[in-house]
Amino acid sequence: MTSFQEVQLQTSNFAHVIFQNVAKSYLPNAHLECHYTLTPYIHPHSKDWVGIFKVGWSTARDYYTFLWSPMPEHYVEGSTVNCVLAFQGYYLPNDDGEFYQFCYVTHKGEIRGASTPFQFRAASPVEELLTMEDEGNSDMLVVTTKAGLLELKIEKTLKEKEELLKLIAVLEKETAQLREQVGRMERELSQEKGRCEQLQAEQKGLLEVSQSLRVENEEFMKRYSDATAKVQQLEEDIVSVTHKAIEKETDLDSLKDKLRKAQHEREQLECQLQTEKDEKELYKVHLKNTEIENTKLVSEIQTLKNLDGNKESMITHFKEEISKLQSCLADKENLYRALLLTTSNKEDTLFLKEQLRKAEEQVQATRQELIFLTKELSDAVNVRDKTMADLHTARLENERVKKQLADTLAELQLHAVKKDQEKTDTLEHELRREVEDLKLRLQMAADHYREKFKECQRLQKQINKLSDQAASTNSVFTKKMGSQQKVNDASINTDPAASTSASAVDVKPAASCAETGFDMSTKDHVCEMTKEIAEKIEKYNKCKQLLQDEKTKCNKYAEELAKMELKWKEQVKIAENVKLELAEVEDNYKVQLAEKEKEINGLASYLENLSREKELTKSLEDQKGRKLEGQSPQQVSRCLNTCSEQNGLLPPLSSAQPVLQYGNPYSAQETRDGADGAFYPDEIQRPPVRVPSWEDNVVCSQPARNLSRPDGLEDPEDSREDENVPIPPDPANQHLRSHGAGFCFDSSFDVHKKCPLCELMFPPNYDQTKFEEHVESHWKVCPMCSEQFPPDYDQQGFERHVQTHFDQNVLNFD
């Protein structure tokens, strides 16, 4: 039958969806629920729908109304699912007497299920009415509706059902309780029988044991009281020991932190000491270099002073000679006029001509000496310019060193402030951490103390309970023994056999049971207490041993800390001594810098005074030269002849050319060093004998740069190369040789300044320092010794010069 139904369901498409509980009629314009079941032969889709069709439909479009079939939740393919749809009343047809049916239509338009036909009819009052007898045993008939009758019946059945369910539950509980009571009674009966047999055998032994247990109980109570006192004492000792251990640990941690800080500070001080030593060596080297430069400047200034002194003496001498020559010229003019008037002898005239020629030659020699003096003066001005440039570089170097010193001091102060701030921060952080640790340890100790206190209270309660139980059992036992004695006396008079059996069954089991229970509980408690006391004694011994170990460790750490403190104090003393030495070095360096500044300022003022005096002497010489040019050579010769005849002051003229007393320090010649100013008179360019004319070209020799290294820093290879290289001729000397005329220096300074490198012209009143800075900007400067090199100097040679400072370990601080 089942196989036939399955085949029929598979073959019939209208049976894939089964509609449940379809009534014969429904009310129009009322809510309608449609219950249907999806069989495993259909796969639901979200576009499937259920429609109400008139019976006799032909296609799926002949529906009256429809609703979308919801997709079932948690649908498993191949399973049966129940679904419900609710049609609203205003979508349903009216009471038209037609038959309708539900149809399930898939999303493809296939009808896969149809219900039984039904109608939409309004309920008539006649059909709904029923007659029934009155429940009050009267002969009256009651007319009611079917719905009301059905509701009454349903209410009655539900009430009866509830009452029956309550009654069934009560009966089930009672039966279960009765069964449990029966089983319990049976078990108790069997247990009581066995217990009576055991207790009868154990009663005699327990009576004796009870006495011994009482004595033992008293002893154990004493022991327990002693043990509790010892436990309290041990707890107090443990708390004190833990506090001491915590204090020692905190002290040890603080000492370790201090030790680490001391080591860190020592390392920092060592690093600072090393850096300060390096700076000290640098300052020493720099001070040496500045002292060398200052000695050179002092020697140059001394030479300039000597030159100025000699030149001043020569200027005074020449002034005297010029005054004497002027007086001689005046006398000779007078004599010449008198001779012309008085004598006409030719011999006298020839003699006078000869004297006049000698006087002219002497005047020419004095003029040449004056020219060379002006040349030497110009050379001195050039030397002054060079010294001013060197002085400017020395000032710049001094300012740079001062700035570096101020920067280093500021950095040291900032570093010290940062170090102090870091120390305070770390100390504050460590103190906070120690406080938190101490709080945590105190909290743990308090918790441990609370636990121990609770445990002691619990043991005290157990002891009190045991003592109460012992007292109660003793009283019960005495009462039972008294009652048993009375029963035994009564049973002797009546029925000895029955009385003995009854007493054995009634009294002995109760007394023996109480005694055995109490004794077993007391034994167990005593064993537990002895175990706890032994454990606490072991803990106390362990804590004592740990405390001893901690004391030994603390002593060791204290000794190590004392040693480290001594070392730290020694390091602090060393650091303070080093700081004092550095402070002394800095003070000495500052004093030396102040002295050097004073010397430089004095030299600058002295050079300014020299330049002013030289300008005055040049202006005086110009005036005197102009006066001499205004007189005729005959008058000069007459004056010289008269002076020579009267005073005999004219020396005989030598045929040798005049020699400079102080050579030109900037002429092109081979010297030992470019800065020493040592010259040889045989190598100086001498002017020709002819009388110089003021119309000749004026040539000013430009001071040449010092291309040699400082003393002690020469490269032997470079010196050998320099010996083979030919010395370039001085352009000023070439100019003199090409003209073949005497050197003449125009003392007037109304000429434009010209840069010797880029040939840029500057006005006469242009600032000398700016002009020197412009000229120096073309030159290469050594970063170590501040030596200057021309712009066309070989780059490799310049690099070799810089490397020589490092090759000879000038800046080696080891």
Curated annotation (Swiss-Prot):
Keyword field: Apoptosis, Coiled coil, Cytoplasm, Cytoplasmic vesicle, Metal-binding, Mitochondrion, Phosphoprotein, Repeat, Zinc, Zinc-finger
Region entry Oligomerization, spans: 320-420
TM annotation in the entry: none
Coiled-coil regions, chain positions: 144-623
Positions annotated to bind Zn(2+) 2: C782, C785, H801, H805
Zn finger (UBZ1-type) start-end: 752-778, 779-805
Consequences of knocking out this gene: Mice genetically knocked out for TAX1BP1 show no obvious abnormalities at birth, but develop age-dependent inflammatory cardiac valvulitis, die prematurely, and are hypersensitive to low doses of TNF-alpha and IL-1beta. In addition, TAX1BP1 deletion impairs clearance of ubiquitinated protein aggregates.
One example GO MF annotation: signaling adaptor activity
Function: Ubiquitin-binding adapter that participates in inflammatory, antiviral and innate immune processes as well as selective autophagy regulation. Plays a key role in the negative regulation of NF-kappa-B and IRF3 signalings by acting as an adapter for the ubiquitin-editing enzyme A20/TNFAIP3 to bind and inactivate its substrates. Disrupts the interactions between the E3 ubiquitin ligase TRAF3 and TBK1/IKBKE to attenuate 'Lys63'-linked polyubiquitination of TBK1 and thereby IFN-beta production.
Note on domains (UniProt): The C-terminal UBZ-type zinc fingers function as ubiquitin-binding domains.
Subunit structure: Homooligomer. Interacts with TNFAIP3. Interacts with STARD13. Interacts with MYO6. Interacts with TOM1; the interaction is indirect and is mediated by MYO6, which acts as a bridge between TOM1 and TAX1BP1. Interacts with MAVS; this interaction induces MAVS polyubiquitination. Interacts with TNIP1. Interacts with TRAF6; this interaction mediates deubiquitination of TRAF6 and inhibition of NF-kappa-B activation. Interacts with RIPK1; this interaction negatively regulates RIPK1 ubiquitination. Interacts with NBR1. Interacts with TBK1. Interacts with RB1CC1. Interacts with SQSTM1.
Name by which UniProt lists this protein: Tax1-binding protein 1 homolog
Protein's organism: Mus musculus (Mouse)
Gene this protein is translated from: Tax1bp1
